[in-house]
């Protein structure tokens, strides 16, 4: 059988590689050659991470897609997605672009910090083992991780960070009072983030419920129900408030408020593979006035209510969206399968923790349905579902005895193949491929 990486027989390492390998040898009592494999994989991740950042910033910049999330404000009334723009307007005045880019990169930074904390917890929890190294190296290449932050920096990165923080703190909470306080803080955070993007509380309700059930060890059923209500209730109320009293007749006023400024817009010329290459290699240029682009492509949507949005999704139809749905489902299955393969903790063991508490996850899952009904970003919703399950699965797995088991040579080979490939392919860029 072909092998992506020869685990045995790696030689010629330089001094830096040897030094890093020695650290891994001491960490998990690895053989020198096996340790060098992980050092080389780590180096591969760093190199490709730098390339992805360079590609997004210098080769194919698409910030115009993400700045528009902060275009609306409360200057003309209470409107959905208005909080981000309102904060920028209050803090930066006429310097919209400086403020918007700051918020954009803040969302990316806090999410990458959250991922770094998860990696650190994987390596520092329990006894040192080789599988911990493998799991720590797997995390950055998952669909919701590094490439998602770089290629798809939606405002939900703030919600993703909040979910990770909430899940981690729950693993440290040992009393009902602490869990109730954490759930209250998380719920209030979701209520605020709903004012930046109305999907955020719905996207992460499932993750919060799974964390409460699985990671709150020895919690009573009553405590879990109270924590669930506190964690998902405030955000849900915010979403309903936006649906009921948020202004819908505001597109023209918002358009008049949007600042002018030229921004790179590669999508205007990226109509064929050849045109994409022409843009990448600098043979053609493409800029758009931010004001004109937002007024044409974004502000008209602020006049739509939820029913009209659902009708538009119905017009697109399930057949057209099936590819996006299938790709997202593939991400979910592949992610959970790789976590199981690397950690050696069976998926059934993880889901067995839900036995007797299925009503709460089902309720949280029901909150995801409006997302699929009112928006066509079906791959994106599946990536968020993947995060909901994966982050709790990972934090659960690192406390299990199975992760201390030494991997077989084949385990390492498969792991290396997968990570090397996923480092190159930015799965997080698949916002809605397949539609």
Swiss-Prot record:
It is a multi-pass membrane protein. It comes from Mycobacterium bovis (strain ATCC BAA-935 / AF2122/97). It is found in: Cell membrane. Its main location: membrane. This is Uncharacterized protein Mb1527. One of its GO terms (cellular component) is plasma membrane. The keyword Transmembrane helix applies. Keywords: Cell membrane, Membrane, Transmembrane, Transmembrane helix. The chain crosses the membrane at residues 40-60, 103-123, 133-153, 195-215, 226-246, 313-333, 358-378, 381-401, 414-434.
